[in-house]
Amino acid sequence: MPGTLSRRTFLANAAAVPAATLIPTGVATPARPSVTTASLIDAERGVIRSAMDGSGIGAAAVCLVEGGQVRWTEGFGHVSGQGSVPVDASTMFSIQSTSKNFAAVAVLLAVQDGILDLDAPITRYLPSFTVRSRFEHAPQERISLRLLLANRAGFTHEAPLGNNYELASPGFDAHVRSISQTWLRFPVGTRYRYSNLGFDLAGHVLEQVAGISYPAWLQRRIFEPLGMHDSTADASVYLASKVRALGTQEGHTQVPPVTPLVVSGGVWTSAADMAKYLGFLLGGGRSGAQQLLEPRLWDEMHGFGLGGDYGLGVMRSERLYGSTPVRLLHHRGGGFGFGCVFTYCRQANAGFAAMFNRATSAGYGIGERLLDQLLSARFGPRQPRVPLSSLAPIRLTQDQMQQMAGSWIGRSGKAKIGVAGNGELQLHRGAHAEGTRFAAIDGDQLFTVDTDGEVATYRYHAATDMLPAYLECSNGEDGLDQNDPIDGPTGPQAPHWQPWLGRYRVDQWGRPSMFVVLEQRHGWLYIDGIRLVAEVEPGLLFTSDGEAVDFRGSQPTWRNLRLRRVAPMGQG
């Protein structure tokens, strides 16, 4: 990449590379793997056993598809502890949010049938649906299936009924109805924010139009055609299985076996079936001689037309191996006692999945080394995509640095931007994280470089009268909302806030999950350190990252989660 990147091409060049030619493939009869692949598989077995030791993972299963063939399926551990049935390639696991990939395919099949339109307002199919917004009138009229599947409709992550915290599942219909009680975090279509609700709503639209349940649609249009006999989203089916893995979570003797998040997190499947699904995706929607999903719709799903790194139910990571730009397509899952990693790469004609019965960092590392070495063997060693010599950082003015300095909040946690001794900005993620150079090539475009030499780009969006400043990141999950600017104005310090101050508990499945403090600083309210920047009516407030905090009723909520008071301010 010779020369210096211009201001307007920087984000595009750093965040995306051309996809290689797409080579159709399918899953064929397993064949003897090459020595190289066999040795990598053998090494990965050691990685898996190491990940399971000491992490609480008692059951895991994996699959590897390469060159149109199933190279590896294997189970590890036992479905519910020592002495129970050993895990094998047919053991069923919950894949949680990896289900969103299936949801996108399910909706696109209905688009292929002509019964759904990706870009029509969802009110065409759900005329009575409404959702609350402080930014615009009738936001539902602007929400499309495309925005739902791309996490760009503005929804929060949890619903009042049926979420990752409540003990009893109210059922999918009640869960979807409760979405109308939620408040959008941002104006429709303006930002990426990961959300279960958008996918569940999209699946509900599909049910209404198709006239059958979402699990039945998956069975008829995906699982049966692909021969995925161990797969279902029907709770009555997976609960009846005597060889399904049992989810586990630290602090809980039991994890609820049924999730109300049927679309966004409800698929159960096996390693053998995931290999078949990987073959379908690597084949561009083809399975054997059958084109199940038209190529144009496969491209729609993986086209990333709205920008960022999230397409329709799939994420991308761009890498460079040797001189070859490589796109990894993936979607993780985690919750209700399970975790899943799921990655496919069409340039290498390879895909990998791992499922495990505890969502731990050790589990999410399974397969990383294997895929990296496969790609290195195919294309050459991994290289940084954007040479630092191509970047020409500038020194920001004092005013520009001042507007970015302060605390920020994002889905991946809290962050702080400060000025280092050399006069450059530093980005700190996490309470004790070392700073990373936060350099600019223009007043509103900045970048960081990670330990692998990869560039992450940010675009600064100034504050408006309704929202704080925002840093849009090429890695969508790392976007940041400004929480506390340096030398920001003093808040209104409303007297009616005083009775609410104190310490609160959020329960998950009937047990304490986290404790948060509602406090007042510099005239502003803060919950868990996040500033409440707007009060649209007495008792209804919104945080700097767009979440609703509601003290109007007898049961206060934050992010639609119930707050149980532990002690007033100054006590407990």
PLM region spans:
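Peripheral terminal and inter-domain segments
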Residues: D372-G572
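Short, conserved catalytic-motif segment at the N-terminal edge
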Residues: V35-I95, I115-D117, T130-R134, R177-W183
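Short, small/polar residue-rich loop motifs at catalytic or cofactor-binding pockets
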Residues: G56-A59, F336-F338, G413
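Short, glycine/proline-biased beta-turn/loop segments that scaffold the active-site neighborhood
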Residues: L118-R134, P225-L226
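Short, surface-exposed loop or secondary-structure junction motifs
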Residues: Q69-R71, F76-S80, S133-F342
